[in-house]
Amino acid sequence: MLHSALLNGVIMVGIILVINIIYVTFLTLRMILTLKGQRYLAAFIGTIEMLVYVVGLGLVLDNLNQIQNVIAYAVGFGIGIIVGTKIEEKLALGYITVNAITKELDLDLPKQLREKGYGVTHWVVGGLEGDRTAMQILTPRKYELQLYETIKSIDSKAFIISYEPKTIHGGFWVKAVKKRRIKE
């Protein structure tokens, strides 16, 4: 009988842990999708999220006198955040804008990036040690690391900073970046 009760306790902890990992993964993805303007997909995920949440919370509240259930709920919450953000990183939704400034004036770098499929706007800027090339580059997030490596392979001392644009309207970027495939 003791063995059966212990087994049931372990199973309950496992169920609560898994349910909360699933719940918080959905919660994290829903929040990210909402921030990226994917409201319908976010609403669908939110519906599933709430179903899972109610079941998980119900199990914990029905067994609140068992501290291991509360701990499993809390640990599942933390793991769910990690899992959700890892999934979002793999999906790499949206675009990034990268601003890069070369160490020295290099008008060939924008051309090389365009040949690889990136949308590039460039201009000459004055730096402390002379003229440099500044570029603004739009790319899907899934190509972000590849873009950094490409820039660094051409100019290892380039200054690079990136951010996620909230809205993109008009110009070459909207039409061409969506159609283009970035070349290795």
UniProtKB/Swiss-Prot annotation:
Annotated localization: Cell membrane
Keyword field contains Cytoplasm: no
Membrane topology designation: Multi-pass membrane protein
Top-level taxon of origin: Bacteria
One cellular component term from this protein's GO annotations in UniProt: plasma membrane
Short name of any one Pfam family annotated for the protein: DUF5698
Chief localization: membrane
Keywords annotated in UniProt: Cell membrane, Membrane, Transmembrane, Transmembrane helix
Family per similarity comment: Belongs to the UPF0316 family.
Identification of the protein by name: UPF0316 protein BLi00691/BL01474
UniProt source species: Bacillus licheniformis (strain ATCC 14580 / DSM 13 / JCM 2505 / CCUG 7422 / NBRC 12200 / NCIMB 9375 / NCTC 10341 / NRRL NRS-1264 / Gibson 46)
